[in-house]
Amino acid sequence: MNNKFPEKLYHYCSISTFMSIIKNKCFWLSDTRYTNDKEELAAFRASVDEVILELLTDNVIDKKMADELWWTYIYNTLPGYISCFSEKGDLLSQWRSYGDDGKGIAISVDFNKLNIEKGGPFRFAGNVKKYYGNKVIYADSNLKNQIKEILKKIIEGKNSMAEIRPDDLCGIFNLSYYSKNEGFREEAEWRIVYLPLLLFNSTTKEAISGENTDLENTKFRTNGEKIISYFEFSFLPDSINEIVVGPKNNSDRDTLSMFLVANGFRNVNIQKSQIPYS
């Protein structure tokens, strides 16, 4: 079988979140503005801004193309929604940061059985809803140079944005939503990304509803301090092939098996973390 994705990618979470995911058969895709990576997304946008300005200053592009390039980038990198996974199913740093300090669960997912496409991500109007999956790119201090090289290749021989296909910009979008600082390489992270179409009145700033927007599909939760929007990403039970019980989680194996089967999940391998952590 020539799979596009790994068959085992792990989502670390608390035991209560694990129960919610299994019961509802969906992951939550969180607003990137409220994730741990929001600073990196802001830094990436600033780098793109600097690169476009440099290309304009160096007469590689003119003002019109600079504006078109910038707004095309902004449109496709408005707040996105992501869910994070790791190639590693028993990693101490992941247990500490995302698995309730070792008291949680790591859910193994076969990405090939999910309704996702590789590449992108792209934002679509109307009823087109596409979810994308890709491996995180761990960028070093030369990220700005990487962005510049990608943009130069995209615009080479082009006189306007009309000559540039959306797929040509895939490299920039990938870097934006799938890039992370080199210091996090140990996480071996993958992401599911969804770019909804959410519109706001330019004068009143009020959200616009309608059949061509995703407002009606937006869900909301609270973190105790603010209201946060998210989207649900549904999956079928056969997408889950294994769970790893955290090093500080004392759940009974038989009870976990009963819970999984009662919710339609069969043939799920149940493993216990091998990390000595208490």
Predicted region positions:
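Partner-binding and oligomerization surfaces adjacent to conserved cores of proteins
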Residues: 1-278
